[in-house]
């Protein structure tokens, strides 16, 4: 085709003759194609490209791309054709002008066939055919590389062409000779179009394959990460760290060996063998290090061929010195943990040998240590849990008994006003007058002073020490009781009550701290009940003694109770943790020797305390008070405050403080002092019932039971007092107030008594638990003050029935508060609770709760 350009440009007049012949044949071929294939011309301005490549725009009909057009209507299709050709990738084009088109003259049939189109073409007479020399020169030009230029011009001509053809549906049948002439061109076009469609489909499939591949790789990486994370918490690994901690001489050595151990565990997930899921792994017999390492991987990991099935990673072979079966070890570990935490098995247990004889070794010490992971990822080791030392129960019982005597004094002081106010307001016994308003202050000033004592107790236990702070409350307790016993006016009574309340606030904060830092975890559950039990004993003792003594003699008894408490406090040491916090390592060692036994190896536990204190010092610079006001912390703080509010405004302290007066006003046929004793006994035993049921029924179930019981009893009590004042005679129902009070105390002790304090430690975030607990405790004391101070005013203004109905209505609102806002925390870890409450978690993992590793990859 480019040869024609050369001839037309440089041939002069004679050179135009072959070009005219070629153009004539081209027009003739165009006419023949249009007739035989059933196409008609839409545009009259045919592009006369020398290469004639525009004829490639004669597209066969495709039902998926072009609509059917009837013979009568032939709309222009130039825009759609041009856009279609521009969007498609460039294809290879070939000229339609063949050698036989040049050498073969047109037939008369072809010359007579007109081109059916909207615009006619004027056909010129056919020129003579080209000579053989011109044909040879044309072929030489094609061989010298003119095809590339022709192809480029063909593409440009194709893009700029505005010629479009539509299929004309005619009934005329074409001759077999015309079909044979055009079959090669049509087949070539169909082949190119099919190839293009295949190429496009392949491109789409390629993108989908890449997307699926990325998804598969992402899932595989996620499974590997989860596997590594779970492997690091394996029980066998924890036991290794336990032995490692005892053998390490420094913190750096422990961390170094720990990293090496974790590296060994993570090698079981080496990517070199992770994807070889289609091979059966067997040990290697070669001596090279690399093959030996691979054999070790294969020996440690047992993977199924299907990666969707659960993968069990057995780490029992990580410790070369341990050849105990993993399942047996796991069962043994669970038994040890159950024994150490079950209060019903608190008696001394012994291991049995194969013959069933006692070995004489206490196995409760086998509980692993609690490992806390701080926010920066470093391990925080609390008081060293595992020890081979026997548990010297008597020394720790002595320490717990000493501080629990302080709790007995607290209970006695709290219940003092209930039996004492009856005789104190009697002018035949008291030399000074105690008005109703003064009596309300006698009962209400103690919780107000307890609020101040709780705030002051926090700094005191840090500066003076836990033991010294508790010891410092003994003498003020004695002085406060003597002030009340020797009082000659109401002011002395109020001063004594205020001083006693201040000591109560300090003791309520420092007693549990001392027990938590001195008693071993194996007996902490049992000994931790002593303060609560002794507090209830103090309340019962006050009720019993108050039935036989007046307010002055009862105060003298209260002054005598702190004396054994004071003596025993001199016998016990300060907590080792406080000594470590002050840098007194030697004194901490002596304290541990006293608590654990002279022959005990206390060095590992002492090192654990020092590490824990170092971590606490790093966190001490953070201002946690500002964290209380963040939005994410307001929900758990509000729930704790709400529980404390409904606990106190259920009227419990009003009932405890004014039990005798309430029974006198009720006109019960049972002696009022006997009624208070019965209430004290019920309160004592109901506390232990709540402890037994709280982990079996759940927190919310017990809160429901407690709230419903208090609502019913308070409503019945209100109705009883209303009928007594305004309605029919109820003297024959003298047993009803005592029955209601017993059920009321029982319901309170099951739920709203212990659970608000328990849930305060569960739902408050770890980062703000200290300051938040102080705020909640102070709020509890404030509510106690309001209830006890205003109870007599309420009964005077609304009547006893109005006060009890008010408390019942508050309990009714509290029931809906529990249903809507209070979460269930039974069986959940602190991480799960914090994640649910705040949406984030601070990792605090106890390996005692870890189950054998089995997870899905």
UniProtKB/Swiss-Prot annotation:
Bias kind Polar residues: ranges: 69-81, 171-181, 330-341
Coiled coil: none
Pfam families (UniProt xref): Sugar_tr (PF00083)
Assigned keywords, A-Z: Cell membrane, Glycoprotein, Membrane, Phosphoprotein, Sugar transport, Transmembrane, Transmembrane helix, Transport
Chain positions found as Phosphoserine: 248-250, 320, 322, 845-846
Region (Disordered): 1-28, 62-203, 327-346
Extracellular face of the membrane: 414-440, 495-497, 550-552, 658-673, 722-740, 792-801
UniProt cross-references to SUPFAM superfamilies, sorted A to Z: MFS general substrate transporter (SSF103473)
A single BP term in Gene Ontology: D-glucose transmembrane transport
Record-linked InterPro entries: MFS_dom, MFS_ERD6/Tret1-like, MFS_sugar_transport-like, MFS_trans_sf, MFS_Trehalose_Transporter, Sugar/inositol_transpt, Sugar_transporter_CS
Compositional bias annotation for Basic and acidic residues: 134-143
Subcellular location: Cell membrane
Gene Ontology annotations for the cellular component aspect, listed alphabetically: plasma membrane
TM region(s), chain numbering: 393-413, 441-461, 474-494, 498-518, 529-549, 553-573, 637-657, 674-694, 701-721, 741-761, 771-791, 802-822
Domain of life of the native organism: Eukaryota
Record topology, Cytoplasmic segments: 1-392, 462-473, 519-528, 574-636, 695-700, 762-770, 823-857
Entry-listed glycosylation sites: 428, 550
GO terms, molecular function: D-glucose transmembrane transporter activity; trehalose transmembrane transporter activity
Function: Low-capacity facilitative transporter for trehalose. Does not transport maltose, sucrose or lactose. Mediates the bidirectional transfer of trehalose. Responsible for the transport of trehalose synthesized in the fat body and the incorporation of trehalose into other tissues that require a carbon source, thereby regulating trehalose levels in the hemolymph.
Family: Belongs to the major facilitator superfamily. Sugar transporter (TC 2.A.1.1) family. Trehalose transporter subfamily.
PANTHER family recorded: FACILITATED TREHALOSE TRANSPORTER TRET1-1-RELATED (PTHR48021:SF96), PTHR48021
Protein name from the UniProt record: Facilitated trehalose transporter Tret1-1
Originating organism: Drosophila simulans
């Amino acid at each position: 085709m480019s040869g024609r350009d050369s001839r037309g440009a440089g041939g002069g007049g004679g050179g135009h003759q072959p070009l005219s012949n070629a153009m004539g044949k081209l027009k003739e071929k165009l006419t023949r194609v249009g007739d035989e294939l059933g196409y008609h011309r839409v545009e009259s301005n045919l592009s006369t490209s020398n290469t004639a490549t525009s004829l490639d725009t004669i597209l066969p009909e495709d039902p998926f791309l072009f609509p059917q057009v009837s013979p009568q209507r032939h709309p222009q299709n130039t825009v759609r054709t041009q856009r279609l050709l521009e969007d498609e990738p460039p294809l290879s084009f070939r000229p339609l002008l063949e050698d036989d088109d040049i050498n073969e003259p047109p037939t008369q049939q072809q010359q007579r066939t007109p081109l059916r189109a909207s615009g006619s073409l004027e056909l010129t007479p056919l020129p003579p055919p080209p000579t053989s020399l011109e044909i040879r020169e044309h072929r030489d030009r094609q061989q010298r590389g003119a095809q590339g230029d022709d192809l480029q011009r063909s593409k440009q001509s194709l893009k700029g062409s505005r010629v479009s053809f539509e299929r004309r549906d005619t009934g005329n049948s074409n001759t077999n000779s015309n079909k044979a002439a055009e079959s090669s061109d049509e087949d070539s076009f169909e082949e190119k179009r099919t190839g293009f469609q295949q190429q496009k489909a392949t491109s789409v499939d390629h993108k989908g394959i890449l997307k699926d591949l990325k998804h598969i790789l992402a899932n595989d990486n996620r499974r590997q990460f989860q596997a590594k994370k779970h492997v690091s918490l394996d029980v066998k690994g924890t036991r290794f760290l336990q032995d490692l901690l005892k053998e390490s001489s420094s913190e750096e050595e422990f961390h170094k060996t720990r990293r090496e151990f974790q590296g060994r565990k993570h090698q079981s997930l080496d990517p070199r063998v992770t994807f070889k899921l289609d091979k059966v792994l067997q040990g290697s017999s070669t001596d090279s290090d690399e093959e030996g390492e691979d054999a070790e991987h294969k020996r440690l990991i047992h993977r199924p061929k299907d990666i969707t099935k659960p993968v069990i990673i057995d780490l029992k072979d990580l410790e070369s010195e341990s050849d105990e079966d993993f399942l047996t070890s796991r069962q043994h570990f669970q038994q040890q943990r159950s024994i150490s935490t079950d209060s019903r098995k608190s008696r001394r247990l012994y291991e049995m040998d194969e013959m069933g004889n006692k070995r004489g070794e206490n196995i409760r010490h086998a509980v692993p240590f609690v490992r806390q992971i701080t926010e920066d990822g470093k391990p925080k080791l609390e008081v060293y849990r595992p020890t081979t030392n026997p548990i010297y129960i008597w020394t720790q019982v002595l320490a717990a008994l000493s501080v629990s005597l302080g709790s007995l004094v607290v209970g006695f002081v709290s219940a003092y006003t209930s039996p004492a106010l009856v005789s104190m307001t009697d002018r035949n016994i008291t030399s000074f007058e105690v008005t109703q308003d003064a009596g309300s202050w006698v009962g209400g000033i103690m919780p107000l002073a307890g609020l101040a004592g709780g705030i002051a107790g926090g700094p005191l236990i840090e500066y003076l020490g836990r033991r010294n702070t508790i010891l410092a409350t003994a003498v003020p307790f004695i002085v406060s009781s003597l002030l009340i016993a020797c009082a000659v006016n109401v002011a002395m009574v109020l001063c004594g009550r205020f001083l006693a309340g201040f000591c109560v606030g300090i003791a309520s904060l420092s007693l549990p701290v001392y027990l938590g830092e001195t008693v071993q975890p194996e007996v902490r559950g049992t000994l931790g009940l002593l303060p609560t039990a002794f507090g209830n004993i103090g309340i019962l003792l006050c009720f019993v003694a108050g039935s036989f003594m007046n307010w002055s003699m009862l105060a003298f008894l209260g002054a005598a109770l702190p004396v054994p408490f004071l003596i025993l406090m001199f016998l016990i040491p300060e907590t080792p943790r406080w000594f470590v916090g002050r840098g007194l390592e030697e004194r901490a060692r002596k304290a541990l020797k006293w608590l654990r036994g002279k022959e005990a190896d206390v060095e590992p536990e002492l090192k654990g305390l020092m590490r824990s204190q170092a971590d606490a010092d790093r966190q001490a610079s953070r201002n946690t008070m500002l964290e209380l006001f963040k939005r994410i912390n307001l929900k758990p703080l509000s729930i704790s405050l709400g529980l404390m509010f409904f606990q106190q405004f259920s009227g419990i302290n009003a009932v405890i403080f004014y039990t005798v007066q309430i029974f006198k006003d009720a006109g019960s046929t049972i002696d009022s002092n006997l009624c208070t004793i019965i209430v004290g006994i019920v309160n004592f035993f109901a506390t232990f019932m709540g402890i037994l049921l709280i982990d079996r029924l759940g927190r919310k179930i017990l809160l429901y039971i407690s709230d419903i019981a208090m609502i019913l009893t308070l409503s019945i009590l209100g109705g009883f007092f209303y009928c007594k004042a305004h309605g029919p005679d109820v003297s024959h129902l003298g047993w009803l107030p005592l029955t209601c009070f017993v059920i009321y105390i029982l319901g309170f002790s099951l739920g709203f008594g212990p659970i608000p304090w328990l849930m305060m430690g569960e739902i408050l975030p770890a980062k703000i638990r200290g300051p938040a607990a102080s705020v909640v405790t102070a709020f509890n004391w404030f509510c106690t003050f309001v209830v006890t101070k205003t109870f007599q005013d309420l009964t005077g203004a609304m009547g006893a029935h109005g006060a009890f109905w008010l408390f019942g209505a508050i309990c009714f609102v509290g029931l809906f508060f529990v249903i809507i806002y209070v979460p269930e925390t039974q069986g959940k870890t602190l991480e799960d609770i914090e994640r649910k409450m705040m949406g984030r978690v601070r990792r605090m993992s106890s390996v005692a709760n870890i189950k054998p590793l089995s997870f899905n990859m």
